[in-house]
Amino acid sequence: MSKETFQRNKPHINIGTIGHVDHGKTTLTAAITRALSAEGLANFCDYSSIDNTPEEKARGITINASHVEYETPNRHYAHVDCPGHADYVKNMITGAAQMDGAILVVSATDGAMPQTKEHILLARQVGVPYIVVFLNKIDMISQEDAELVDLVEMELSELLEEKGYKGCPIIRGSALKALEGDASYVEKIRELMQAVDDNIPTPEREVDKPFLMPIEDVFSISGRGTVVTGRIERGIVKVGDKVQIVGLRDTRETIVTGVEMFRKELPEGQAGENVGLLLRGIGKNDVERGMVICQPNSVKSHTQFKGAVYILQKEEGGRHKPFFTGYRPQFFFRTTDVTGVVTLPEGTEMVMPGDNVEFEVQLISPVALEEGMRFAIREGGRTIGAGTISKIIA
C-alpha cells in the first residue's frame, strides 16, 4: 500500500501547557482537542489518554510527555503536556520540546503558586518567546469573589512582566466545563485558541539556514535500508540531497533517499518537523543517537569549549557539595551525552550549588557543537546544571 502524502498547507507551531500541579493543564489540553474536533480540526483526546504518557528520553533524562496535534483554521499545532513538575523542568532545560510559545494554566481559585513561578522562570531561561494565560476553574468562583479574579490577573501580569513577558493575554474559562461540552465554556476555548493564533507569532523558521537534524533513533527497514529519526533543527532536506553524519565518530557522507512524517511520504522535510530519513549505503550500526545529519561542511565536531553554566541548588535537585577542577560529569547536547572534564577559570577554586560560572570543558568524544547551543550537565542520574556554549576552543 502506498503511503498517503502528508498535507502541508498551514504553518506549523510547537506549543505546550505549563503551570502548577493540578491547575488543569491536562484537562485543558483535552478540552482544546474536544472543541477543535467539533470543527473537524482535531481528533478528540480524552484526559486519560493524555495523562497516560509514554516515557521518553531527552539527553538521557527520562521524561514523561504527551504529544497531541490539532489545527485551527490558520495553523497546525503540535502540543506537549507533561504530567509531573519534574518532567516539565527536564523537558524545558533539555529543550526536548522546543516551544514557540506556551499556554500558562493558572487556577483562578489559587492564583500563582510556586510551580507557576518556576515555570515562568524556566520558560524565560530556555527561551520560550511568548506566553498566553488561561485562567482556569472560573466556574468555581462565586459572584462575591469575582473581584479576587481581577487581583489574580494583576498579580500574574506583574509576575510575567518581571520575567520579560509583557502584555500577555489572559483568557478566563473552565477546562472541565468545556470538556463536559458546556457551550459557553467551549466558546472560551475557541477564544483561547484565537489568542494563541494572534499572540504567538509564526516563528521565523530556520528554513534558510543550512540543514541540520540531531538523530534521536535509528531503525532498519528490511528491503529499504536504514532510517534515522529526529526533529529538524534548521534548514530543509530533500530527497536526493547529499548530507554528512557528524559527531561521535569520523564524519561520513551519504544521500537522503526518502523523507517521511507521521508515516506519510514527503518530497522534503523542513525545520521544526519530526521526520524519518532513509539513508543510502548506511548500515544500522554506522549511525547512532547523538550524531547529527547536516548539510556538508556546515557543522564540525569538537571536543573543547567554554560554557556559561548555572549549577542547580540542592533544593532544585542539584548537588549538595561544591566541585573543583577535574570534575567529570556527563554533558548532554541535543540527543547525546558525553563525559567531560571541567577546568575552572583562574582564581575560582570551587563551584557551589546555585552558582553561575563560566568554565572550560574537555569532552572524551567529539560532538557536533556550535556557539550558543544549550546543554545539560548530569551526574548520577540527575541534572546538576544547565548551560550555553559561549566559545568553541577546539
Swiss-Prot record:
It catalyses: GTP + H2O = GDP + phosphate + H(+). SUPFAM superfamilies: EF-Tu/eEF-1alpha/eIF2-gamma C-terminal domain, P-loop containing nucleoside triphosphate hydrolases, Translation proteins. InterPro entries: EF-Tu_GTP-bd, EF-Tu_GTPase, EFTu-like_2, EFTU_2, G_TR_CS, P-loop_NTPase, Small_GTP-bd, T_Tr_GTP-bd_dom. It comes from the Bacteria. Residues 174-176 are annotated as: G5. It holds the Pfam family GTP_EFTU_D2. GTP binds at residues 19-26, 81-85, 136-139. GO terms for molecular function: GTP binding; GTPase activity; translation elongation factor activity. Residues 81-84 are annotated as: G3. Residues 60-64 are annotated as: G2. Residues 10-204 form the tr-type G domain. It is found in: Cytoplasm. Residues 19-26 are annotated as: G1. Mg(2+) binds at residue 26. One of its GO terms (cellular component) is cytosol. It is an enzyme of class 3 (hydrolase). Residues 136-139 are annotated as: G4. The keyword ATP-binding does not apply. GTP hydrolase that promotes the GTP-dependent binding of aminoacyl-tRNA to the A-site of ribosomes during protein biosynthesis. NCBIfam families: EF-Tu (TIGR00485), PRK00049.1 (NF000766), PRK12735.1 (NF009372), PRK12736.1 (NF009373), small_GTP (TIGR00231). Belongs to the TRAFAC class translation factor GTPase superfamily. Classic translation factor GTPase family. EF-Tu/EF-1A subfamily. This is Elongation factor Tu. It comes from Chlamydia caviae (strain ATCC VR-813 / DSM 19441 / 03DC25 / GPIC). The gene is tuf.
